[in-house]
Amino acid sequence: DRISAKHYGVAPTGNGRRDTFRNTPIPRMRATYMEAGNMKEADIISTVKKGIYCDQFTNGQVQIGAGDFTFFVKSGYLIEDGKLTQPVKYINIIGNGPKALADITMVANNDKIDNGTWTCGKDGQSCPVTCGMPSALVSKLTVGGES
């Protein structure tokens, strides 16, 4: 982390981590979090004509340089005319991080830290991480898989 901080001319942040003592520390994420908004989740859902409500995620990958990502939706629901209808599972959400953040149009007030066990994989290492965020409406993402 100190080497990267010096290279980029910024203060070290303590993000140099490694999965075992045998490996060299490398800069990586620890926790990813989004602040809560001021809307109720139900009010956001009511604005959606057709969409996917993603309840649980697993197995994500990010191409760091490009920001492209894919996340596997373990469980969720189809949104039709502002209501949660059919359950969906085994679908992928595909997008680009900076673009997806720019496409967030509404953020709910139901922030929470995920209770799952997440892992950040980088350069052959795996370190535990956590994430948290409120419900958010992203206007455009690619959805694929089976219902």
Please state what every model-predicted region is.
Residues 1-147:
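N-terminal small-residue-enriched
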